Amino acid sequence: DTPDTPMLCGQAGSFSGQKLRVPRNKPISMGREASCQLVLASKQVSRKHCEVRLTADGLVIRDLNSANGTKVNGTRIPPQQDVPLKRGDRVEIGSKDECFVIQ
């Protein structure tokens, strides 16, 4: 990884105050299930909620048909579609209680 590799910076919830570098070609899955790379405790989060991937075109997030949705900058994203992320974007997972910012 290089210094310009995007990072997820926890703002609230289970991941608050932590930073996680996004590796190329290895999705970071998020949810309540123990098999997820990022396990989030909130009841608003689905077992397999969403995943973030670094592609050749940049960082994308995909909601995995979660019950309470995933928001990017306050707007709920459609399920099962890659949505581009850029530095400074704020992502809410299930609710504003679990969120991170792209750095």
Question: What residue ranges belong to the model's regions?
Answer:
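Intrinsically disordered, low-complexity acidic Ser/Thr-rich regulatory segments
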Residues: 1-43, 53, 87-90
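Short, well-ordered strand-loop elements centered on a beta-strand within folded domains, enriched
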Residues: 5-10, 58-64
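Short, surface-exposed beta-strand-loop junctions and turns on beta-sheet-rich folds
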Residues: 15-16, 36-37, 46, 60, ...
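C-terminal boundary/linker segments immediately following FHA domains
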Residues: 30, 65, 71-103
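Solvent-exposed beta-strand sheet faces enriched in polar/charged residues
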Residues: 41, 53, 62, 101-103
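Residue at a beta-strand N-cap/secondary-structure junction
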Residues: 44-45, 58, 82
